[in-house]
């Protein structure tokens, strides 16, 4: 079996999956997931890249999954959800923890491949924090927003010591595994970064809440996507998350 570390570089399709759970059930789901659903997905081509606790919502479990391409995605998902002994044995218990599991963004790289350096699976979580910032595009052209990001936002991030490890945008191909719904009508552009600890992340998070002038260079065609404050997630890796 390949490890998640070996599979990371081949992914061109991604899912950012946010599950809303019943109160007090997050650790139950994480325990099930880490014991049963990481290697068993990876072996069929559905690569679990990271599993996280949302620091700002105790009832939210977030994970990132990757696939080689859209052609292999339905095959991998059918192999896992239709035939994997691990899923068939534990799906009722897992589903019983969830209020909602349909908050899914189907994504592709906006430019260069993500630098998602997975670690060997172990049993201890690092103190790292991952931040995800999500801009909702509406009808804004993704290429125009990407140009604004590269020339206006990215230099400000870099000047603050932040270097995104992934920049992703909505994959607008139809969902080819309809048993698992995705948010097909929400077009987004997002970036992801890593901090060594919550203390390292906190100054930037505070700074970003009071950023002034970041919209100044936005062309008129991009304005609808920047008038809404972006959604921000602060994510702490679980103990066996490939991303640590």
Question: Which stretches of residues belong to each language-model region?
Answer:
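Short acidic/glycine-enriched loop/turn segments that link adjacent beta-strands
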Residues: 56-59, 174
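Hydrophobic, helix-prone linear segments
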Residues: 1-15, 20, 25
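Short, solvent-exposed loop/turn elements at beta->coil junctions and helix N-caps
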Residues: 52-53, 170
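Surface-exposed interaction/gating patches
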Residues: 16-23, 28, 109-179, 183-198, ...
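An amphipathic, aromatic/His-enriched active-site/gating alpha helix that lines ligand/cofactor pockets
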Residues: 2-5, 9, 28-50, 56-57, ...
